[in-house]
Amino acid sequence: LSKRAPVAVVSLLVAVLAGCGDTGDGTSSGTGGGGRTLTVFAAASLTETFTSLGKTFEGAHPGVKVRFNFGGSSALARQITQGAPVDVFAAASPATMKTVVDAGDAAGAPRVFTKNRLVIAVPKDDPGKVGGVRDLSRPGLKIVLCAEQVPCGAAAKKALDAAGVRVRPVSREQDVKAVLTKVRLGEADAGLVYRTDARAAAPQVRGIEFAEAATAVNGYPIAEVAKAPQAALAKEFIGLVLGGQGRTVLTQAGFEAP
């Protein structure tokens, strides 16, 4: 009996230790024992800035993961009104946010936190020799624009109309990043994108300012989504975006004050 006792004690200790290390409840050590996920839908043009702010938010909230869905604002708004579980929505135009508000899917009034304007994006070698907005109507030039139903497309139409320039794009894309990609890859001679996107893609892409862009500056509203799964975290994230840290990150990226 005395010889078996130590073996029994060791076996018991192993069992206890194994039980302590069990993560069968679905909680891993990386989530801080009860991790939560904040889901943010945001316009594609916010990819770089919101990714940075997301890391800041996670650093201040151990155990919290910020999950982003970046894309065309109109498509994101449609997903929200169709019931997607989302905590925060940041759109690239008040008109797009209005569709969410009108559907009763915004908790409280949205707040415009920044503004953005268009530039002409050209590849770094500028094969089309584009010098300004009037060059966009030149025959043979491959121009790419956003679809008119998304904020960057609506802004492009307004700016081009103000310039009196008629453009026949070779394609219309669902978000500004898709336009930027075609320009960067040399599949287009030029495209209209937000200033911040052209700056983020430098030096592969160069942005050309034009005066008429001032007629189509887009305001970016942000709101907590109604029935947000993480309502308290949503409010805190919005506070970060609206606060000093958010303003610094946005300004450094080329966004304008609201």
Where are these regions (language model features)?
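Bacterial N-terminal signal peptides that target proteins for export
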Residues: 1-9
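A short, gly/pro- and small-residue-rich
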Residues: 103-110
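Bacterial N-terminal signal peptides
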Residues: 8-18
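Exported/periplasmic ABC-transporter solute-binding proteins
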Residues: 4, 17-59, 65, 74, ...
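Periplasmic-binding protein-like
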Residues: 87-91
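Short, glycine-/small- and polar/acidic-enriched structural segments
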Residues: 110-118
